Design a protein with these regions (language model features):
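Extracellular, repeat-based ectodomains that mediate carbohydrate processing or recognition
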Residues: 27-458
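Bacterial N-terminal signal peptides
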Residues: 11-23
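Intrinsically disordered, low-complexity regions enriched for glutamine and histidine
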Residues: 1, 26-27
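N-terminal secretory signal peptides that target proteins for export/translocation
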Residues: 1-11
């Protein structure tokens, strides 16, 4: 948490189309996707529609945007390759707090947006107590969304508390379970509690009918964590699907990086396997931010290239004395793993921090694309962004600076817990929060590569 249909026509009444873009020598275009009336948007995600790559959907929360006094979830939709965007609110008939937004597409162009939905957290005697995770579905590229289906929901209680979902659709052409939707997340017995009897665990559910219903959630973590929401909490579970429908999940916690998998379409999982340590933990103190993290995310190469089936894990830790971005991979379903590859290419042990990393593996060309916040070129709290791309199976990366002016975060403004990126057919689109004249906004950077190469189209 670390904090009826909605129509396209109604969306234009809530937010106008807003465009801010410029092109630099690397043929990169930065476009602001939140309109001027957006209030503190954060926790971003983005997905490219494989049926129509000019159609993309990004998502974020906004803090207290009228008419609602609470944080709510929003979609940002484009049909022209990212040149212009329209804001579409996520349905919220119950008027609950929303957040931790993640959006994905299925191979047939159906969009899924999962988010938290809760009220009464951190209140001793809440007037209203409810919490869960809702999945909204769009079959028209994000113009309209279903009211939402609970993947899990608790009425009249916030214990346990469900937090930080990751979602994936099985888009593997040869999978027996193609089209299944999988969600993994952290369950807190009591969110924020330091009581050692209160535990956190990783839970899982699936849908086999395009998000209309979800199975009974079950625990997949063999070893849990505490409920403090820090290094010893199990968190950061992001599912990925292999070419034969394997479901892979990696999370962070007191044991380090932990891996689990399902070979039966998400009906059951095996024993946890610790695949790496996390020097310095996953919860960081970053100047200018209320909090920051290096929690892992996962993705699989579903292309027909030489690295098909490779599972990648991307995270941040302090093994070199400062915070660096890393990638590790397995080509045999998690039995053996590569050594960690340092993704950021600034000088080793230079004391500069990277944080909030996210990854997308292009399903057509197999490239590994990673975005992260970066302080290599600045001092103090000034922050930039870097996009790193690998076309050799994650062995080496080319780092490119995203062309936004360095900014200083405001610790009094919630900055979220992650960035986002999506890649498809050589098109790569990172999405991120940044400050412009003291105001928090969300932008995308539009890159177009010759597939499978580092060559950028002009």
């Amino acid at each position: 948490m670390r904090q009826k249909f909605t129509s396209w026509t109604n969306a234009t009444r809530v937010g106008i189309i807003f465009l801010l873009s410029f092109t630099i020598a690397t043929a990169q275009q930065v476009v602001r996707i939140t309109e001027p009336t957006a209030i503190d948007p954060a926790e971003v995600s983005i997905a490219i529609n494989p049926k129509n790559p000019d159609n993309m959907i990004a998502a974020s929360l906004q803090i207290g945007r009228p008419p609602g006094p609470r944080a709510g979830s929003y979609n940002y939709v484009t049909f022209d390759g990212g040149k212009t965007w329209t804001t579409v609110p996520t349905p919220n008939a119950s008027k609950l707090v929303q957040g931790d937004d993640v959006v994905v597409f299925s191979s047939d162009g159906v969009a899924y947006h999962v988010h938290l939905s809760f009220e009464g957290i951190r209140q001793a005697r809440p007037a209203r107590a409810e919490n869960g995770m809702i999945v909204n579905v769009s079959k028209d590229g994000g113009k309209t969304w279903t009211d939402g289906t609970p993947a899990i929901n608790h009425v009249n209680t916030v214990t346990p508390f469900e937090d930080k979902p990751g979602i994936v659709v099985d888009n593997a052409p040869a999978s027996r379970w193609k089209g299944n939707t999988y969600i993994a997340w952290t369950r807190f017995d009591v969110y924020g509690s330091a009581n050692p009897e209160h535990r956190s665990q990783i839970y899982f559910t699936r849908s086999t009918d395009q998000g209309q219903t979800f199975s009974m959630p079950f625990r997949i973590s063999d070893t849990g964590g505490d409920c403090v929401d820090s290094d010893n909490t199990v968190e950061g579970a992001v599912p990925a699907v292999g070419p034969n429908g394997e479901v892979y999940i990696v999370w962070a916690g007191p044991l380090g990086l932990v891996f689990d998998k399902s070979l039966d379409g998400g009906l059951s999982f095996g024993k946890d396997k610790v695949i790496g340590n996390l020097p310095g933990g996953w919860d960081f103190s970053i100047q200018g931010l209320e909090r920051a993290n290096g929690m892992p995310n996962t993705a699989v190469d579903l292309s027909n290239g030489p690295n098909k089936g490779t599972l990648y894990v991307n995270w941040i830790d302090a093994r070199n004395g400062d915070l660096d971005v890393f990638l590790m991979s397995t080509r045999d379903g998690g039995e053996t793993w590569s050594l960690p590859v340092r993704v950021n290419d600034d000088k080793l042990k230079n004391g500069k921090e990277q944080f909030f990393t996210w990854m997308s593996v292009d399903p057509l060309d197999g490239s590994v694309n990673i975005v992260f916040y970066d302080r290599r070129d600045s001092s103090g709290a000034l922050t930039g962004l870097t996009f790193a791309r690998s076309v050799d199976g994650g062995k080496t990366f080319v780092n490119r600076k995203i062309d936004v002016p360095p900014f200083a975060p405001n610790s009094n403004v919630f900055f979220g817990d992650y960035s986002g990126i999506s890649a498809h057919g050589g098109r790569v689109v990172p999405v991120f929060m940044h400050f412009v004249e003291g105001k928090l906004v969300v932008s995308v950077a539009l890159f177009k590569f010759k597939p499978g190469t580092q060559e950028i189209f002009p």
